[in-house]
A protein has these predicted regions:
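Conserved phosphate-binding/catalytic loop of the ribokinase/pfkB sugar-kinase fold
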Residues: 119-123
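Surface-exposed amphipathic alpha-helical tracts and adjacent flexible/coil segments at the periphery
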Residues: 1-22, 26-37, 49-52, 58-86, ...
Length: 676
C-alpha cells in the first residue's frame, strides 16, 4: 500500500514554512490573479522561485493553483503566468477552466495537471473524461460518502485527491454563484465574499442555514489510506501558519497511529465553526452539520497554543541523512564528498594540508566536525575517512569544507529538469451568427407549460414522464448533482427518448455521451472565454449556454465556431447543495417543495429539491425582454422557468415576443456589471 501524500495549504511564506517543517509531502499555493484565493498573500516574481526552491530543497512537491475562470482580455497575462510557473520548476498545476487547460497544454505539455474540485466531477465516467483531457489527478468533491469514495478509488484511471480537513462550502464547488450575484465577487474567480456565512434562515431553522461546520476526517486517515487515495488535502490558504502546522502534525500522527484527543482539541481551538463535521463522509446529513463562527471559537486559540506550533516550524528540519567521504592526502588538496538522495557534490580545500607540528588530525576529530549539520536540511548519516599520518587540518577549515559541501548539495536538491516551453498560438475559426437568435425555453415544472409554446427548443427535467418528451419534442435537463447516481441517469435518459440534453457538468456530458444523445452545454460548465468554448465543442457539445457570469460585452467579443447562447430570463440557481437547508426547520412532507430561505434583510430565496440535491434560486429573475437588441453575437437565448405558474409563464413569453418593459421585480443579472 502506497502512503497517501499530505498536501498542505500555503497562503504565505510563513505558512509554507510551517507546512514543510511540520512534515507535509507537498504544498499548494497560488500566484498572481488566477487562483481561487486571490486574497491570500500568494507568491509572485522572485517569491515564487524562492518558494519552489525552498520546497524542493526539502523534498516537498509544489502544486500551483490556476483554478479560476479567465476572461479573453486576460489571456496574455495568463500565458505569461503559465510560462513563469513552468520555468520555476513547479511540480503540478491545479486547473478549473477548460480554456486554461488548453493554454497550459500548448505552452508546457510536460507539466503534471490536476483537475480542481471546482470542475465539479464526482463520477467515474466524469473522471475518465478528465483522464482523456490529460489530467493525472482529480480532486474529489467534498460531498461524497465513504462508499462513493471507495468505489471511485477502486476504479479510477488516474490519481484521486480528497479534502480531509478545513472549511466546508454549502455549495458543490464550481457551482456557486451566491457571492457573484450578491456582490459581483465571484467564487469562480477567487474572490468569494462568503455571504453564506451570514444569516440565511429557513422556517424554524438554525439562523445560519447555509453555513456548515468545518470538515475533519483526519482520524479516518488510516482507513482512507487503504482505499487507494493518493493525496490527503488540507484546506486553509487563508489560515495562520500555526493552523497549517497543527493540521499537518495531526494528519501525520493519524497515519502513524498516534492521533490523540489533544490533536483534535488543538485543531478545534485554532479554527472551527461550532466544532467539526464528518457528515457527507458518513452519509449523516442534517442539522448537526451546520455551524458558524461563535465568539468562543474566535478567542479559543491561546498564546501558549500558538507558541507550541510556532516552535515546531521555526527551526529547520533535517530531511536527508548525508554520507561523507573525506580524503586528506599529503600531496593533494583535501577532498570532501557529500551524498544524499542519489546526489553527490565534492569540494576541495584551497591548499594542500600542512604537516602537523604538535597533534595530527585524526578520524575522531574529522567525525566531530562532520556531524555538525544542525540548522540545515541534513542530518549526519555516516562517513568514510582516509587521512595520511602526520597531517594538520584546522577546525575552521574543516567546518568551512562541510558548510560548502552541504550548501552545494542543497543547491543540487533544488534542481529539476527544465520543462519544454512553447508558444501558445490558438487560432479560431469563426461562424456566422444568426441575424436573430433562436429561442430556447426550459421548464422545471411540466404542469406549468402553456399550450402552443412558440420556441425553437424546449427542455424539461430528466425526471419527466417519457410521453412528455415525445409530446413536446423536448430535450432533457440533466441533474447537476449525479454523484453515485450515474448509471441510473444514463438509463433514464435513454428511456426518455430525448434527442438532446442540457449538460451542466462534465459528469452529465459523460452521461449524454453514453446515452448517445446530442450534448448542449449548460451555463454551469462555466464557459467563460473563447478557448473554453472551443474546448467544450471538442468534447462533443453542439452548442453551449455561456456562464451566467459573462457580460453582454464579453459575449459580443467571443470568438470561435461553437454555437453559443445566453440566459435572458429566469431565476438563476445560486447554489447546488447535497444537504437541504430547509430540513433544518421542517421535513420534506412539511416543505411541499415550495420553501425558501430569508436573508438578514428579509429577502426570500426559493429552494427546490431534485435527485437528492437542493438548489437555492435568486430572489428575482433575470429580465431582458426590453433589451433584446443589445444581445449580440448569440445564436440562441434561453428562458428558464422555475417557480412561475402557467399564467406567469404565458405573460413572460408574451413580453419577450413584444419586447415589453418589466412589470415584475427583476434583475439584469451580471449581463452588464459582470464579476471582478
Amino acid at each position: 500500500m502506497i502512503k497517501p501524500e499530505i498536501l498542505a495549504p500555503a497562503g504565505s511564506f510563513e505558512a509554507l514554512t510551517a507546512a514543510v517543517r511540520s512534515g507535509a509531502d507537498a504544498v499548494y499555493f497560488g500566484t498572481g490573479n488566477f487562483n481561487a484565493r486571490r486574497n491570500a498573500s500568494n507568491f509572485s516574481g522572485d517569491d515564487l522561485q524562492r518558494a519552489v526552491d525552498f520546497c524542493h530543497e526539502r523534498n516537498v512537491k509544489v502544486h500551483i493553483t490556476l483554478n479560476t475562470l479567465v476572461k479573453d482580455s486576460e489571456m496574455s497575462e495568463l500565458k505569461e503566468s503559465v510560462r513563469r510557473i513552468c520555468k520555476s520548476g513547479a511540480d503540478a498545476l491545479i486547473l478549473q477552466d477548460l480554456g486554461v487547460l488548453r493554454v497550459v497544454k500548448d505552452i508546457c505539455p510536460d507539466i503534471e495537471l490536476h483537475a480542481s474540485t471546482q470542475m465539479s466531477v464526482g463520477t467515474l465516467d466524469g473522471i475518465r473524461n478528465l483522464a482523456d483531457l490529460g489530467f493525472s489527478r482529480a480532486v474529489l468533491p467534498r460531498e461524497l460518502s465513504k462508499d462513493e469514495i471507495k468505489y471511485l478509488c477502486e476504479n479510477s484511471p488516474i490519481e484521486l485527491e480528497m479534502f480531509v480537513h478545513g472549511a466546508l462550502c454549502m455549495c458543490v464547488s464550481g457551482q456557486c454563484l451566491l457571492s457573484a450575484f450578491l456582490g459581483s465577487r465571484s467564487g469562480n474567480r477567487g474572490l468569494c465574499a462568503q455571504p453564506c456565512r451570514l444569516p440565511f434562515t429557513a422556517e424554524n431553522g438554525t439562523g445560519h442555514d447555509l453555513s456548515l461546520k468545518d470538515l475533519s476526517l483526519i482520524e479516518y486517515a488510516p482507513i482512507l489510506s487503504k482505499t487507494g487515495i493518493s493525496s490527503f488535502k488540507i484546506e486553509g490558504r487563508m489560515k495562520r501558519p500555526e493552523y497549517v502546522a497543527a493540521a499537518v502534525m495531526a494528519l501525520k500522527n493519524s497515519l502513524s497511529g498516534e492521533y490523540s484527543s489533544e490533536n483534535s482539541e488543538d485543531l478545534c481551538s485554532l479554527f472551527s465553526r461550532s466544532g467539526f463535521t464528518k457528515g457527507y463522509y458518513e452519509n449523516a446529513l442534517g442539522r448537526n452539520m451546520f455551524g458558524f463562527r461563535e465568539k468562543e471559537n474566535v478567542t479559543s486559540a491561546t498564546t501558549s497554543l500558538l507558541k507550541k506550533y510556532e516552535r515546531i516550524y521555526e527551526k529547520e528540519r533535517a530531511v536527508y541523512r548525508v554520507h561523507f567521504v573525506l580524503s586528506v592526502k599529503s600531496d593533494k588538496k583535501i577532498s570532501l564528498t557529500a551524498s544524499a538522495n542519489d546526489l553527490s557534490v565534492t569540494v576541495l580545500s584551497e591548499s594542500l594540508p600542512q604537516k602537523a607540528v604538535n597533534r595530527p588530525f585524526t578520524k575522531e576529530e574529522a567525525l566531530l566536525r562532520l556531524k555538525k549539520c544542525g540548522g540545515t536540511v541534513f542530518s549526519f548519516g555516516d562517513a568514510d575517512i582516509c587521512i595520511d599520518d602526520g597531517l594538520s587540518v584546522s577546525a575552521a577549515e574543516m567546518n568551512a569544507l562541510r558548510r560548502e559541501a552541504l550548501l552545494r548539495l542543497a543547491d543540487r536538491l533544488k534542481e529539476r529538469a527544465p520543462y519544454r516551453i512553447n508558444k501558445a498560438n490558438i487560432i479560431f475559426r469563426n461562424r456566422k451568427p444568426n441575424k436573430k437568435p433562436q429561442t430556447y425555453v426550459s421548464f422545471r415544472d411540466t404542469s406549468a407549460i402553456p399550450q402552443n409554446v412558440e420556441c425553437d427548443k424546449l427542455f424539461i427535467p430528466l425526471s419527466s414522464k417519457p410521453e412528455l418528451f415525445e409530446k413536446y419534442s423536448a430535450g432533457a435537463v440533466l441533474p447537476r448533482g449525479i454523484f453515485g447516481n450515474f448509471d441510473e441517469i444514463v438509463k433514464r435518459l435513454i428511456k426518455s427518448g430525448a434527442r438532446y440534453a442540457l449538460c451542466n457538468t462534465l459528469d452529465s456530458v459523460a452521461a449524454a455521451k453514453k446515452a448517445g444523445v446530442q450534448i448542449i452545454g449548460g451555463p454551469f460548465l462555466n464557459i467563460f472565454n473563447s478557448v473554453s468554448l472551443s474546448e467544450i465543442q471538442k468534447l462533443g457539445a453542439a452548442e453551449c449556454v455561456l456562464s451566467y457570469e459573462m457580460t453582454l460585452k464579453q459575449l459580443t467579443a467571443l470568438e470561435g465556431e461553437c454555437r453559443r447562447g445566453v440566459c435572458v430570463y429566469g431565476r438563476v440557481p445560486l447554489m447546488l447543495t447535497r444537504n437541504c437547508p430547509v430540513k433544518n426547520g421542517k421535513s420534506c412532507r412539511e416543505c411541499g417543495g415550495k420553501s425558501f430561505l430569508r436573508d438578514r434583510k428579509g429577502i426570500e430565496f426559493p429552494v427546490r429539491c431534485t435527485n437528492g440535491f437542493s438548489e437555492l434560486f435568486n430572489s428575482r429573475p433575470i429580465y431582458m425582454a426590453d433589451r433584446m437588441s443589445e444581445v449580440k453575437n448569440a445564436d440562441f437565448v434561453l428562458l428558464e422557468f422555475t417557480t412561475e405558474d402557467k399564467e406567469q409563464i404565458s405573460s413572460v413569453l408574451k413580453a419577450y415576443q413584444n419586447g415589453s418593459s418589466p412589470e415584475i421585480e427583476f434583475t439584469r443579472g451580471l449581463l452588464y456589471r459582470g464579476v471582478e
